[in-house]
Swiss-Prot record:
RNA chaperone that binds small regulatory RNA (sRNAs) and mRNAs to facilitate mRNA translational regulation in response to envelope stress, environmental stress and changes in metabolite concentrations. Also binds with high specificity to tRNAs. The gene is hfq. Residues 9-68 form the Sm domain. Residues 72-99 have a biased composition (Low complexity). This is RNA-binding protein Hfq. PANTHER family: RNA-BINDING PROTEIN HFQ. GO terms for biological process: regulation of DNA-templated transcription; regulation of RNA stability; regulation of translation, ncRNA-mediated. Keywords: RNA-binding, Stress response. Gene3D superfamilies: 2.30.30.100. HAMAP family: Hfq (MF_00436).
Length: 99
């Protein structure tokens, strides 16, 4: 995953998963509204009365109708696991030096 997408993907996924209505403003000023059906590295599929494939390079701003919790739980779990492994390794090293 690209470094720039580490915030983008969880945010868009939360909007998709919770079916939060969004307003998407394009760089040319056009406002699109709907729900995010799907997305990938390059496009967002926006659903309203019709489905629209919107290229991300044309998007200026994504505005949700309400607040969204977009914490990257997977990254947080990985960090906690790594911290626990490091603490365990340090504990094992300390106990073997004491013997």
């Amino acid at each position: 995953m690209a470094k720039g997408q580490s915030l983008q993907d969880p945010y868009l996924n939360a909007l998709r998963r919770e079916r939060i209505p969004v307003s998407i403003y394009l760089v040319n000023g056009i406002k699109l509204q709907g729900q995010i059906e799907s997305f990938d590295q390059f496009v967002i599929l926006l659903k309203n009365t019709v489905n629209q494939m919107v290229y991300k390079h044309a998007i200026s701003t994504v505005v949700p109708a309400r607040s969204v919790s977009h914490h990257n739980n997977n990254a947080q779990q990985q960090y906690q696991q790594q911290a626990a492994q490091a603490a365990s390794a340090q504990s094992n090293e300390t106990s073997s030096q004491a013997e």
